[in-house]
């Protein structure tokens, strides 16, 4: 089984097809009577020969074939079992259900009568199987982005499909950490603390689900519909009422279903989710019995209060380069506003793109539907034409049959006349010998003409039947070609729509990559600004430390001078020279990199960078 962690205890890819359906077998008692009519004789291996008894003439009519196959219900019989697997990793969209039929060998019964010959064929279905194809993935699946608690903040940032590669903020010593947390750097810190791992894991699971669905579809056998074995066209259907036995069986299945737990568990084991219905539910880690494991809030109010006090204290202690900090705060706020405007623009573009895609799909579906309707209309017209041709052929066959009946009637009358003539010749044998010879010759000629007429009528009937069959086959072939053409046009329209959607997606990905590149450049620029500000703060701190050291040295020198003066006052007065000696003041040597303007250099750097940014925006 495959669980949420992605770990599997069996091979995910196997040559054995995955079972994703149920097979139900029920006896069917509903019947449909199909009548096959033909106006021409059907030649088969079993035929009834014409027998003549004495002077009696027997004429057989065309064979009438009557078949009575059992009715096959083309509806889906859902399993009454309460076992249902509804938790899947993908959405199920318009899963068509196919029904297959299997028939036993037809049983044929022959009538013992020879006038006319008939036979009956019955098809009894042994079972039928209904299955649902594998699950299909839809790109409309709602994507949920989860972030750890450590990355949450009061400012919510909408996740986007663009990957943002973040780097941790460089740590600085405590005495140089002048910038308080949450003051000015809140937007940038929250943006850099977002985790791209959730987006990556969502994309990985989506690709894995699509691959598994494709493998299941490849290994699922598609059972073809069983076709009828009779070569005769179906001309009509006769429906009989449903039997009470089927209704009783359905009620019994609903009220008292027969279940096989081991088999059901075996079937469920093929699904990518565990059978949570037959196992004990997982205990809630936050149940009342576990008081010690109660979830802690995201931010402790006491901790928040302490942080606020620390921030206020650092603000009071912050006395160096307040103007520079204001500039940094203004720059970061400007970057935050630009990012928010960019997100609003992306959201509007996404909505517009979704609307255009929906309209394109709707138009493609309408075109495909219209093409299918036109193809169906053309096929119906061709079928009507074929039916008219078949009716015309049937009328011609009927006319030929009437001609055959007239010929048979004439033959019967000739036979009666022949018998009367024979009787008359027997009575007047002595008187009309020459007349009898003439009548015999006329009777022979007339008989030959009757046989020739009968043979011609039979050949004409066979020819008309053959033409009708060819016309019907041509009509059926034309209808099938029209249906195939409509399906091909619909498929071409669908491929065109998919191609347009793919091109739109490629353009959108290119635009998103360009935006990602611009955003990364902006982040790098902000990081450089922050790095330069930290370097400037470190330099100023070093200068202050050097000034403090020099001041301490001056204070020590002054203290030594005062002590020396006090010692000199206690000694006798010594005459000083006439030329006064100038006292040299202590020289304070500063580094060459120290400037007298304090934070003005940092302000000049910021102004230069702002001017460069404005020039880039104008370009």
Curated annotation (Swiss-Prot):
The keyword Phosphoprotein applies. Signal peptide: none annotated. The keyword Phosphoprotein applies. Residues 570-581 have a biased composition (Low complexity). The modification Phosphoserine is found at residues 79, 81. Residues 285-304, 333-373, 389-504, 558-619 are annotated as: Disordered. Residues 602-619 have a biased composition (Acidic residues). It comes from the Eukaryota. Residues 393-418, 425-441, 448-504 have a biased composition (Basic and acidic residues). Keywords: Phosphoprotein. This is Uncharacterized protein CG45076. It comes from Drosophila melanogaster (Fruit fly). The lineage of its organism: Eukaryota, Metazoa, Ecdysozoa, Arthropoda, Hexapoda.
């Amino acid at each position: 089984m495959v669980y949420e962690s992605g770990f599997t205890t069996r091979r995910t890819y196997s040559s054995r097809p995955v079972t994703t359906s149920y097979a139900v077998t029920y006896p069917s008692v509903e019947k449909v009577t199909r009548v096959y009519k033909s106006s021409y004789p059907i030649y088969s291996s079993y035929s009834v020969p014409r027998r003549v008894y004495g002077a009696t003439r027997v004429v057989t009519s065309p064979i009438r074939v009557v078949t009575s196959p059992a009715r096959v219900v083309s509806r889906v019989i859902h399993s009454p079992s309460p076992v249902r697997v509804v938790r899947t990793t993908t959405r199920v969209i318009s899963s068509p259900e196919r029904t297959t039929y299997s028939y036993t060998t037809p049983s044929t019964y022959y009538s013992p009568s020879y006038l006319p010959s008939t036979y009956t064929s019955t098809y009894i279905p042994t079972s039928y199987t209904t299955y649902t194809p594998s699950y299909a993935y839809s790109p409309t699946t709602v994507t949920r982005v989860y972030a750890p608690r450590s990355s949450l903040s009061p400012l919510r940032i909408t996740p986007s499909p663009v990957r943002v590669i973040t780097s941790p903020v460089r740590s600085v010593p405590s005495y140089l950490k002048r910038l308080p947390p949450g003051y000015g750097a809140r937007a940038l810190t929250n943006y850099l603390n977002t985790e791209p791992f959730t987006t990556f894991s969502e994309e990985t699971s989506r690709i894995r689900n699509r691959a598994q669905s494709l493998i299941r579809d490849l290994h699922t056998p598609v059972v073809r519909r069983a076709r009828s074995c009779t070569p005769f066209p179906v001309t009509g259907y006769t429906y009989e009422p449903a039997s009470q036995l089927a209704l009783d069986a359905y009620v019994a299945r609903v009220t008292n279903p027969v279940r096989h737990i081991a088999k059901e568990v075996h079937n469920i084991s093929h699904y990518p989710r565990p059978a949570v219905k037959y196992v004990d539910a997982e205990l809630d880690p936050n149940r009342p019995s576990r008081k010690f494991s109660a979830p802690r809030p995201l931010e402790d109010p006491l901790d928040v209060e302490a942080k606020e006090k620390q921030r206020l204290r650092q603000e009071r202690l912050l006395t160096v380069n307040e103007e520079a900090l204001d500039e940094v705060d203004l720059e970061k706020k400007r970057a935050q506003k630009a990012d928010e405007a960019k997100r609003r623009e992306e959201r509007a573009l996404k909505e517009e793109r979704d609307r255009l895609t929906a309209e394109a799909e709707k138009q493609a579906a309408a075109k495909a539907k219209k093409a299918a309707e036109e193809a169906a209309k053309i096929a119906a017209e061709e079928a009507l034409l074929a039916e008219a041709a078949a009716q015309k052929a049937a009328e011609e066959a009927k006319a030929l049959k009437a001609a055959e009946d007239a010929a048979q009637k004439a033959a019967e009358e000739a036979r009666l006349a022949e018998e009367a003539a024979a009787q008359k010749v027997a009575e007047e044998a002595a008187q009309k010998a020459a007349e009898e010879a003439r009548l015999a010759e006329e009777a022979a000629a007339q008989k030959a003409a009757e046989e020739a007429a009968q043979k011609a009528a039979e050949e004409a009937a066979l020819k008309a039947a053959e033409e009708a069959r060819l016309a019907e086959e041509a009509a059926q072939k034309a209808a099938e070609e029209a249906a195939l053409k409509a399906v091909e046009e619909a498929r071409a329209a669908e491929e065109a729509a998919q191609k347009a959607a793919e091109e739109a997606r490629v353009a959108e990905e290119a635009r998103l990559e360009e935006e990602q590149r611009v955003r990364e450049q902006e982040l790098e620029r902000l990081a450089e600004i922050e790095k330069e500000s930290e370097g400037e703060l470190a330099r100023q701190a070093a200068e202050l430390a050097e000034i403090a050291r020099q001041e301490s040295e001056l204070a020590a020198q002054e203290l030594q001078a005062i002590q020396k003066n006090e010692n000199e006052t206690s000694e006798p007065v010594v005459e000083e020279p006439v030329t006064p000696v100038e006292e040299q003041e202590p020289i304070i040597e500063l580094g060459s990199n120290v400037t007298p303007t304090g934070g003005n250099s940092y302000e000049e750097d910021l102004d230069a960078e702002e001017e460069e940014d404005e020039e880039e925006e104008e370009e």
